[in-house]
Amino acid sequence: MPATTATTPYGQNWDLDSLLPHPAGEEFTKILDGYRHGLQGLAERSDKLPAFSPGGDQGTAWVAFLRECERLEMLATDLSAFIGCHAAADAANKLYRQVEAALSALDPLREKISTNLEFALRDAGEADFKSLVDADPFLKGNAFFLSQRRKNARLRLPRGEELLAADLAVDGIHAWGRLYDRLSGDLRIKVMEKGKLVEKSPGQIRFDSPERSVRQNNFYAGEKAWKSIADSCADALNHIAGTRLTMYRRLGLADHLDMPLHKNRMNRATLDTMWSVITRRKGVLQKYLAAKARMLGQEKLAWYDTQAPLPGAEEPGQSAEIPYESGAGLVVRTFSSFSQDLGDFAKMALTQRWVEAENRSGKRQGAFCTGFATKKQSRVFMTFTNTHDNVSTLAHELGHAYHSWVLKDQPFFLQDYPMNLAETASTFAEAVLAEQRLAESKSRWEKLSILDHMLADAVAYLMNIHARFLFENRFHEERAAGELPAERISELMLAAQKEAYLSSLADDGWYPDFWVSKLHFYISGLPFYNFPYTFGYLLSTGLYALSQQAGKDFPEQYRGLLVATGCMETEPAV
């Protein structure tokens, strides 16, 4: 791991220039053209793949084909991550949108290669498949990947229909996702601050002020802004879900959860058990919300109260705000308390400018971690507004980055892991931060604040995410009968929130239009971007408890689990 110095400041802007040439330059255009030509050539080769069986030159031909697949997929990962980073940091930039669209237009070629690969693997007999895989070190090293792709073929339309669907998706389902990115990226929220009306990006809006009037002002200003694009977002949501349902119907899938579970390498029984246990036991969180309401002087909390600081949770004379430099340092220190390897990694990522955290207008909402396969690096995006919740977000995203770092020397095809296991690494990092802070806290004010944040996280993963799941599930059920207007979508959201939160919030304190503001519903390539968070949270909580019993050997065992996420199904991996 590259050395870093203790005196290096943690800058708030990431370094993208060392990864690829700027998208506006000729060098980037040359790389993009080379990628396009490479895909075209590989797509043609994929039409003539030999049988996946021993004998003749089949093994040599397959290794050569898969190595070229590997090279181009690594480049695809880099290009997509690179332009995604630029677009997130400068949401209004039309050039970045054009490059995103250009990359999306190449997806049918990737899909053609993938389809031909999976059909060839599917057509191989079990004995031939095993014999050829075992005969070559490269194939044997990627046996899990090949088996997964073989399994994927069962969820494919006939070849011609599959390729047509991929072509149509560029200006169909994925275009609706890009439309949402543009609408939300252009959105500005007008709020009153110190007697002046100022415009902010959604990611700059905070609900953690100790003054309820400020939280209300921010909430209603945000609600008004999001409502202005609700009808367009309803169109996007309807067509994203409608496209999926059409595909599922053509595939003969009776349950719209089959595909999300397949993508997470997870059994339906695991999902059902998880929600069943949570539903039975989250009454304790209802008690927490009621206690917090009493401490805030409210009969029940409103949506905008859930992140409010508790009275007395701030030590007299101290500010509840935490500057980025201090927050980043806190993450490094707490990570180091778990393992030197994790701490050194976080320090390296921060000092080498892997993180974009500046609080400024013009950025997209949300936070993410994305990887650059050829560079063996990651980049983290967020907007740091000087809150302890932001520190948790930073830890969360660096947990993702550490996961990729641990896998960086594995075969590229075994560096891909499902979202539920991805969220295990990120939420484990949050747990390390929170538990270490709690252990080190000295005053009752500090302990109270940390416990409040930990319980608020539990509400987020076990109630808020549950509401998203219930909403998306019922939305898909109703969407099967036709499109839903924005008003009906909001009704579904309200019902899901009340059920998931056990009606713990005030009657006028819900957020029916939450579906408009939540990016996760509009990610066209990942349906049900919700339950994996809860799975990861529960698993990471259990892992942290085990770490307290296992002693000094646990960090290495944890690394072993992260490696297993790229080459195993979910249940066996854990």
Language-model features and meaning:
Residues 2, 6-10, 17, 23-24, ...:
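C-terminal, non-catalytic "cap/extension" segments appended to globular domains
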Residues 295-337, 343, 403, 450, ...:
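Long, K/E/R/D-enriched contiguous segments that form extended
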Residues 1-317:
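A well-structured
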Residues 317-322, 355-377:
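Catalytic zinc-binding patch centered on the HExxH motif and its immediate surroundings
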